[in-house]
Amino acid sequence: MEGKGMRKWVYKFHEGNADMRELLGGKGANLAEMTNLGMPIPQGFTITTEACTDYYANEEQIREEIQTQIFEAVGWLEQVNGKKFGDNANPLLVSVRSGARASMPGMMDTILNLGLNDEAVEGFAEKTGNPRFAYDSYRRFIQMFSDVVMEVPKSYFEKIIDEVKTDKKIKYDTELTAEDLKELIARFKQVYREAMDGKEFPQNPQEQLMEAVKAVFRSWNTPRAITYRRMNDIPGDWGTAVNVQTMVFGNKGATSGTGVAFTRNPSTGAKGIYGEYLINAQGEDVVAGVRTPQPITQLEQDMPECYREFIDLAMKLEDHYRDMQDMEFTIEEGKLYFLQTRNGKRTAQAAIRIACDLVDEGKITPQEAVLRIDAKSLDQVLHPTFDTEALKAGEVIGEALPASPGAAAGKIVFTAEDAKRLVKENKKERVILVRLETSPEDIEGMHAAQGILTVRGGMTSHAAVVARGMGTCCVSGCGAIAIDEEAKEFTLGGYTFHEGDFISLDGTTGKIYKGDIQTVEATVSGNFGRIMEWADEFRTLGVRTNADTPADTKKAVELGAEGIGLCRTEHMFFEQDRIPKIRKMILSKTVEGRVAALDELLVFQKADFKAMYEALEGRPMTVRYLDPPLHEFLPTEEEDIKALAEDMHMTVEEIKETCAALHEFNPMMGHRGCRLAVTYPEIARMQTRAVMEAAIEVHVEKGYDIVPEIMIPLVGERKELKFVKDVVVETAEQVKAEKQSDIHYKIGTMIEIPRAALLADEIAQEAEFFSFGTNDLTQMTFGFSRDDAGKFLDSYYKSKIYESDPFARLDQNGVGQLVAMAVQKGRSTRPDLKCGICGEHGGDPSSIAFCHKAGLDYVSCSPFRVPIARIAAAQAALSDTEK
C-alpha cells in the first residue's frame, strides 16, 4: 500500500503486538496482542504516538500524509464490516479513545457512535429495527462529541435531559421514547449551534473523525494531564496514540450488556473474578455510575453461555500477560466482545499479595515480583488509611499537595504549643495542626499532632520534609485557606472552622474533609516481609535512615534500615529544657561563658547519642555537627526574651541588640555549618566529646562494636575541613586517653556546596567518607532556595522548562553530574572512600536508580521511606543485570 519512504503512522490491530507500547500506546498494543491471540475484538486501527508528536511539531495540524493513511484504514474497516462510513442504509460507526504508553487517568474521555448524522441515524434505525436505540445512540454521540471535542460543558445537556424527563413525568433515561429522543437531538443541536457561534453540528463523518483525533492529541497537554505526568515521572514528549474501533452495542435490549471486570480483587489482591455489568447499556454507563450495576456473578444466571466464555477468556488473558487484568467487555445480542484489557491498577496491599501469589502459582519469578511493585506506592501500606465506608460519607472541602502520606482526623489547633499541651493533658487526644507555614521550633507540636495542614509551602517545604521523617500525615500549600491565627479560625470550602472543630486529612491524595473520619491502622503483613526479603537479596546499595530520636531509629530499624546516614544534632537542641542553654551559649560575650553553657548541653547531647547507639545495636551512625545559622535558635516571642534576659542578667534591649546583630540577609549561605566550628571551635569540641563518650560507654555497657562517623557539614575547601578536623581529632584522642579506649572513629564531610564537588579529590585527602546533602547541593547549583522556589516553579512546569520538582527528583543532568564527578574524584585520591546520599532524594525511586549507577555505597532516607528505598535499590540492580 504505502510507497517507499512513506512513514507508517497508522497500524491495523493485527499489525501490532504487546511490545509496541511506545508506538501504539498501552491500549493499542494490548488490542493488537488480543487480536493476535484470537480474542473476540471489534476490529480497528491505531494512530501512533509519533503522529501526536508530529501534530505538536507541526503547529497543531495533522499533515496530509497522516490523514490519507487514516482514511485508507477506514476503507479497510468498511470492507471488514460490510458497512459504509456515513451511509444512510448501513452506516459504519466507530469509537475513538486515547491511549498513552503509560496508563493515565484523566486523559481524554471516550467518544462513542462516531459516524452518525441526521441521515445515517435513519438508516441505522431501519437496519436495526430499533428506532429508540438509534436515536439514543445519536443523542449520546452529540453530547460526547460536543463535550469532549468542542468543550461544550456536559451540564448543558444534562439540564435538557432533566427538563424533558420532568415534562414527560418520567424518572429514568431508559423510559424516554424514540419521539422524546428526537426532541432531545433537536435541542442538543441547538445548544451546539449557540455554543459554537452559529456553526452547525458536523454532518460529515470524515470531519467528525479528524476533529476527534485532534481532540485526543490536545488532551495530552491539558493542565490535568501535565500535573499527572509530573507526579508520576512521565515525560512530556511521549505523546498519546488514538484507537479507532468498530462500535459494538450493549444497549440493544435484554440480551445485550456491558461491564468491567478484574481477574483479581484490586483492593485486596484476592484471586477470583471481581467486577460488575449492566444489561442494556453502553460502556460509559458502568464507569460513569449512572445506573447501579450488578455483580459479575449475576451474569451466570442471566447468560450462562456468555459467562463461561468470559471466564475462560479472562483466565487466558491473565495467563498470557502473567498479571492481574482489568477488562472491558460488551455483549451484543448474546455475542461477547472484549474492548480492552490492561494490567489492572491496584492498591499497594493488593500489589504485594498478587506478586507473591503469582510467584507461588509459578507464573513469575521473585525477581519479576520485585520489579512489579511500584516503590512509591508502598507509602500506602505503612500509614493509616481512612475506612472506605466512612470516607464515602465524608465531605471534601479542599485539596492541596499530598506532602506526607497517611490519613488523620482530629481537632484543629493553630499553634505547636497548643498541640503539645493538649496531647500532654490527654494522651488519647487527636489534633490537627493548622499553620500558615511551620518552622523548626514547631517540631514538638508537629510530633504531637496526628496531621499537619499548611497554607504555604510545597512538597519539599519544612513541614513536608519533617512530617515525612516522622511518618505524620501532611497536606501542604492549601492557598484556598483564609487563616486568622490571632482569632484562631480559618475558612475553606464555604465553611468557617474554629479551634477544637474536627477536620480530616488524606496525605496520600491531598484531600481535606470536614468532620472526623474514622481511620484504620496499617498492618505490615507476611507478604510484605517476603517482598522485602527478596529485595534485600537482589540489591547492592545499602539503605540507611535519617533519624534524630531513638523512637524514629527503632521504627527505621523495624522497617529494615541498616544504620543512620544522617543524625541532625540541632533537632536535639530545640527541646524545651535545652533551648535556653543553647541561647545562653550564643549570647555569651566570652569563650568561658560559652564553654560553661556548652558543658550544660554536653550532658543532654551525650545522653541523646547513648540512646541512639543503644537503639542501633551496633549499626553505624553518621552524626552531622551543628548546621543551621545561630539565629534560628534565638527567641522571637516577647516573654521568651524577658526570661532569657533575667536568666543571663542582661537587659531586654541588650538581648534584642545581640539578636539583631546575628540576623543575616541570606542565612542559607551565611554563618552556618562548619563556619560555626571555625569561629567557635568550642562547639565542635563539645559535640566530639559527646559522641566519643557516648560510643565508648555504650560499648562498655552493652558490648556493641561502634565506629563513630563524624560528619562536618557545608565544607567547600580542604583547609577549612582540616581546621575543624584537627579540633575534632584532638578532643577525640583526649577522650580516648581519659577512658583508656582504643575505639576507631571516622571523620568525613557533607558534599553540599558545588565547589566541594569540583575539588573532591583535594577534600578526600582529609575526609574518610562523603555524604551528599542533595537538598543544599540542589539549592546552590540551581541558585534558588527550596522555600521560595514553590512560588515560581509552577510557571516553569506550565511552560515546560522543568518537568519535575528538582527538590523531589534529583536533577540528573546538572546536580547528578556534580555527584558522579565528586565520587570519581574522591576515589581517585582515596580508593576506599565510602559515599552515600542523605538528602530527601534518598527516598525517591528514580534518584535511587541514579545513585546505583553513580556507584554510591548507600542511600539514606526518612524512616517510613526505608522500604521504598529497599525496593527501588533492588529494582535498580535488577534493571542493571537485565541490560
What are these regions (language model features)?
Residues K363-A448, I512-I517, F528, M532-D536, ...:
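Protease-associated
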